[in-house]
Amino acid sequence: MATKAVCVLKGDGPVEATIHFEQKGTGPVVVKGRITGLTEGLHEFHVHQFGDNRQGCTSAGPHFNPLSKKHGGPKDEERHVGDLGNVTAGSNGVADVLIEDSVISLSGDMSVIGRTLVVHEKEDDLGKGGNDESTKTGNAGSRLACGVIGISP
């Protein structure tokens, strides 16, 4: 069983990141790292279904959602497994990421290994935007950078 993973995110623009995942036993997954090149403010941060970046971030598919739920916030009962919420970039364009999530895993049916991590252009409305797109994607706009999550030593 994997206990650590890493993801290097890149896109067509200046946004890039290295994000680390760690899980002890069946406990929550700690997600930490730094994203650079963002505009100041909130940006949606999600695990997407496929580990396929052959056509850029669009080939990663929809949010990772094996339980067929509607999009929501990371603390909501109704959420996609891959819904990690927002990261906040300061005026320097840097977002320091520190998330503890009890829904994703590094093994089993909820495993994010081999899937794509994506940072988006806009803020995630956490499924509360009052329209169909909100309950699918959080109205977060384009995909700025992405990478496939892989097992690390």
Swiss-Prot record:
Domain of life: Eukaryota
PROSITE patterns named among the record's database cross-references: SOD_CU_ZN_2 (PS00332)
Manner of cofactor binding, per the entry note: Binds 1 copper ion per subunit. Binds 1 zinc ion per subunit.
Enzyme class: oxidoreductase
Phosphoserine modification, residue list: S102, S105, S107
Keywords, alphabetical: Acetylation, Antioxidant, Copper, Cytoplasm, Disulfide bond, Lipoprotein, Metal-binding, Nucleus, Oxidoreductase, Palmitate, Phosphoprotein, Zinc
Residue ranges crossing the lipid bilayer per the database entry: none
Requisite cofactors: Cu cation; Zn(2+)
Gene Ontology annotations for the cellular component aspect, listed alphabetically: cytoplasm; cytoplasmic vesicle; cytosol; dendrite cytoplasm; mitochondrion; neuronal cell body; nucleus; protein-containing complex
InterPro entries: SOD-like_Cu/Zn_dom_sf, SOD_Cu/Zn_/chaperone, SOD_Cu/Zn_BS, SOD_Cu_Zn_dom
Residues modified as N6-acetyllysine: K122, K136
Chain sites annotated for binding Cu cation: H46, H48, H63, H120
Disulfide bridges in this chain: C57-C146
Record GO biological process: auditory receptor cell stereocilium organization; embryo implantation; glutathione metabolic process; heart contraction; hydrogen peroxide biosynthetic process; intracellular iron ion homeostasis; locomotory behavior; muscle cell cellular homeostasis
GO terms of molecular function: copper ion binding; protein phosphatase 2B binding; protein-folding chaperone binding; superoxide dismutase activity; zinc ion binding
Lipidation (S-palmitoyl cysteine): C7
Post-translational modification comment from the UniProt entry: Palmitoylation helps nuclear targeting and decreases catalytic activity.
Principal location: cytoplasm
Residues annotated to bind Zn(2+): H63, H71, H80, D83
Listed name of the protein: Superoxide dismutase [Cu-Zn]
Source organism of the structure: Oryctolagus cuniculus
Taxonomic placement: Eukaryota, Metazoa, Chordata, Craniata, Vertebrata
Primary gene name: SOD1
